[in-house]
Amino acid sequence: MSRKHYKPLLLGLLTAAVAGVVSAQSTTPPDKDAAFRQGIPAAASKHQAGLPGGIVTLHTPGADRSGYTRTPIKHVILLIGENRTFDHVFATYTPPRGQTINNLLSEGIVNADGTPGPNVAKARQWQASQTGTYTNAPTHTSPFATLPSMNTGGAPTQAPFSSAAQAQSIEPALPSDAYEQLAEGGTGLPNKVIDTRFPTKLANAPVDMHASLSYNDYANSPVHRFFQMWQQLDCSMQSATATNPSGCRADLFPWVETTLGAGNNGAKQPANFTDQSTGEGSTAMQFLNVAKGDAPYFAELAKTYTLSDNFHQSVMGGTGANHIMLGYGNPIFYADANGNPIAPPINQIENPNSQPGTNNWWIQDGYGGGSYVNCADDTQPGVAALKGYLGSLPYRTFRGTDCKPGAYYLVNNYNPGYMGDGTPAPLGSTQFTIPPTKQDNIALLLSKHNVSWKYYGEGWGGGKENGEAGTFCNICDPFLYSTQIMTNPTLRANNQDINDLYTDIQNGTLPAVSIAKPDGILDGHPASSKLELFEGYVKKIVDMAKANPKVWNDTVIMVAMDEGGGYYDSGYVQPIDFFGDGTRIPLLVISKYSQGGRVVHTYYDHVSFDKFVEANWGLDATISPRSRDNLPNPIALRRNPYVPVNAPAIGNLMDMFDFSRGPWSAAAVQDGQQN
């Protein structure tokens, strides 16, 4: 079962004060793949120098090179929240004087008070028709006269904790004055009913949440899956312009929500199907209003440090695939014990063609259904449409979209191939777990070059994945998928918990590269969390780093989302390959070299973090020949800084810093170029 699927249930149990909740992989059902599993390496009991579980030589052991950098940055900490697009958070943000920004307010789509602006038609949403073979650009029928009503979905009726004291007894990662937030904000309504906190009639426009809810309230989560997001963005070269050369119209968000939602796992369409049957309504059109005080801490960070308004999720869709792309620079595929591609169970293969007699109700898709796609085979469902569109672009996509032959890539959320203790996870048609992978990743590249790294996953529990009442996000840890890491005790030990991060910050013992993930309570995921909780998680870490002058002097903290969560966003999307990019997401860069409230327009996605690491530590290497860190830095025109003219291209985040003093001003560390 996927984290995205079980998380609302998890919070319901927390509401009832059940502290013994377990993670998605805690139980061990009968292993139907015993024969297959015999060939998969288990965790080694002894570490041999340089040998991950005795499988592959990583490097010749040598001196730690973590301190050898091309900039004054010696430590980077990436904090990853969940499921918010750039416009969803910063729709009405006004930057400091002298800075420009691309958001709903600057585009005239909304006014600062959240009402529709003079250019609201730019965000008009349409109804469409797909009654047969999948297309990423379905035929438009008519615009919505009014948007479908909001739905409560899986948002909790009551807050997950009965008191701040109860929350603090389980959850360690908030400032002491923030625990009341976990005992407040329930909807007061049942799940999957019309959300009466919002107006009954909604204009065909982005919806200001502040007008109906407190920033402290829980709200629903929209669909955020692979083929659905391709449809929501509705990309066609017939709509391409000079400022939007990919032709992505972003005008089918509520239609996809209300016709299919998060998938059906192969089930037939329910009888008496309506625009509320998927439990979403028009959730995707909601936005927070910083001009009215929403997201106050992130707005403060943006005005103090550096904000990107052109950072994107790397993969269309959800959490698992985007964390994997961050770690590997490439999606991972279903593999045998030798790491070679093989076909997954048939019920786990995506089929986004419509069931007969339905409009966009698919044959096979869901967290307990289809999530793999063989994109090298144009006869596979959904593949020809996407490759046809990609082939029509005015530039050649990355590697010509040459998916590995016979490889079924994971494009949504499945459990990783290893438990936290290095035990292989059960496989089978009902397990929804991807086998371990031997594909290369950024951690292996760092280890090869003797650069230190850690992944701090809150709730890790020493590998038991049971901390914080079992709210550890297993699908978020890219390295739980890796044979080379999980079978090597030394490398596996780099998976740590939130208190280990606190200790390393306070003691000045941070590794060079840190990735940190909150648990499912604080990650900001709609329905199961709130953005203010992720703000609190970030604030505790930032304050701790600033309190240690040694750490603050040479550390950068980057704050990003894993993906946009299916929310509407008005920004440009650059198709790179079959898998994405997807919508914009926020990126804040916090350091003494990133001050002044700048807004950077250079084109980035998650793999830009990998490029930053490679550039800063002078690795002069990429993760693999297929990884996106091989892409060039973008070149853009001054009149349109958001669109790389050398597409596909992604930056290395160096533009997020001001290294203008001392030896760090060398052009070698710069990022994008403007002509």
Language model segments and positions:
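N-terminal pro-sequences and low-complexity stem/linker regions of secreted or lumenal proteins
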Residues: 25-675
